[in-house]
């Protein structure tokens, strides 16, 4: 009787392990896809930021254009 219980428990553990391995592989594929998508989005954001900076003049004057502060 003890052997049947041990065999059933072992079979259950092997089954769970197989499902866990499948789940881990699926999660790995998902994480890898998300990392690639995030890298693309970072590049896209960087390009948009550069375009925005290039297209809008800055409201802050450069130090050469600033008038010197009054001296007291």
Curated annotation (Swiss-Prot):
Segments passing through the bilayer: none
Database matches in InterPro entries: SlyX (IPR007236)
Pfam family, one: SlyX
Region (Disordered): 52-72
Polar residues bias spans: 55-65
Family of this protein: Belongs to the SlyX family.
Name of this chain's protein: Protein SlyX
Gene source species: Citrobacter koseri (strain ATCC BAA-895 / CDC 4225-83 / SGSC4696)
